[in-house]
Amino acid sequence: EEFIDLALHAQKMGLQVILVLEMPSELDLILERCKKMGVRPTLGVRFRLSAESAGHWSGSGGDSSMFGLNISQLMRVVDTLREKGMLDCLRMLHYHQGSQIPNIRAIRQAVTEATRVYVGLVSEGARMGILDLGGGLAVSYDGLKGATEGSSNYGTKEYCADVIEAIGEVTAEAGVPHPDIITESGRAIVAYYSVLVINVLDVNRFEPHRQVALEKDAPSLVRNLWELREESRKGPAKTNHERLQEIY
């Protein structure tokens, strides 16, 4: 209740706050707090996709996700909001496909499914306007650009192009205005700037080299080497002749 009240107070202050339903039971609590505080909320729903994904963390999203509403639960939310005269409060559809999705085809399938659900909500009378794609944008750790767990067969530009194209095709076919698109691609943002922090276990120290002086009776070979050393300290040689020195 405190978290919901905080969000509603922020909305009263003029901030744009969207309360996203991740479980069916959350709707009654939100409506109760809204009625007590006299606030019409801005709502979103997290939808549980049926499209299959791939990758090491594929179990955290899609139809097997612990969070999100299936299609029947989503329609019950729509019916409840319609009965309360608050269907216009539903503004956003959100889903989370998983993390590190290596295949662009799986991402496109998920976007297409979610957009069709979005279009269906608009046809039911929901105001909508926002589509949150969640995470999934992969990082090619091995640089091989393959559809494996540690890689991806697409880049950021291809991801953006496929997402926008898929959304545009479905919405245009249904005659629905294009939504504002939100992504939560945290991995793709921070992975390139990772820092390894460890405790210092030990320190090796080295004494500086003792300054050596050229002795007066030094052999000619040593003198030649000394002169080369001194010349190299003055800077790069100007000609090829100055770069060569034959020592006997």
Question: Positions of the model-derived regions?
Answer:
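C-terminal active-site-proximal or functional interface alpha/beta core segments in diverse enzymes
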Residues: 90, 99-248
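Active-site-proximal beta-alpha core segment in soluble small-molecule metabolic enzymes
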Residues: 1-130, 139, 155-158
